[in-house]
Amino acid sequence: MSPLIAAASVVAAGLAVGLASIGPGIGQGTAAGQAVGGIARQPEAEGKIRGTLLLSLAFMEALTIYGLVVALALLFANPFVS
């Protein structure tokens, strides 16, 4: 086992989780802010806005989970590290 490959796998796993969390984090903050603004403008549409927001947040969170899966694969199922 090459120590360089093992170190690169750990660095890549950290980058995978970190970079996969940036986009959805920004998107979730923006979506929540827009939803609060929409509810403030139209309180009667609160239920519809909230349902759409929760569905959107679930899809955004899936992207972060994909990054976590890639990181776990790099750490524990890496074919280059024996």
Swiss-Prot record:
Keywords: ATP synthesis, CF(0), Chloroplast, Hydrogen ion transport, Ion transport, Lipid-binding, Membrane, Plastid, Thylakoid, Transmembrane, Transmembrane helix, Transport
InterPro entries: ATP_synth_csu_bac/chlpt (IPR005953), ATP_synth_F0_csu (IPR000454), ATP_synth_F0_csu_DDCD_BS (IPR020537), ATP_synth_F0_csu_sf (IPR038662), ATPase_proteolipid_c-like_dom (IPR002379), F/V-ATP_Csub_sf (IPR035921)
Molecular function in Gene Ontology: lipid binding; proton-transporting ATP synthase activity, rotational mechanism
Keyword Iron-sulfur set for record: no
Chain positions of site Reversibly protonated during proton transport: E61
Similarity section: Belongs to the ATPase C chain family.
Binding partners and assembly: F-type ATPases have 2 components, F(1) - the catalytic core - and F(0) - the membrane proton channel. F(1) has five subunits: alpha(3), beta(3), gamma(1), delta(1), epsilon(1). F(0) has four main subunits: a(1), b(1), b'(1) and c(10-14). The alpha and beta chains form an alternating ring which encloses part of the gamma chain. F(1) is attached to F(0) by a central stalk formed by the gamma and epsilon chains, while a peripheral stalk is formed by the delta, b and b' chains.
Other facts: In plastids the F-type ATPase is also known as CF(1)CF(0).
Stated name of the protein: ATP synthase subunit c, chloroplastic
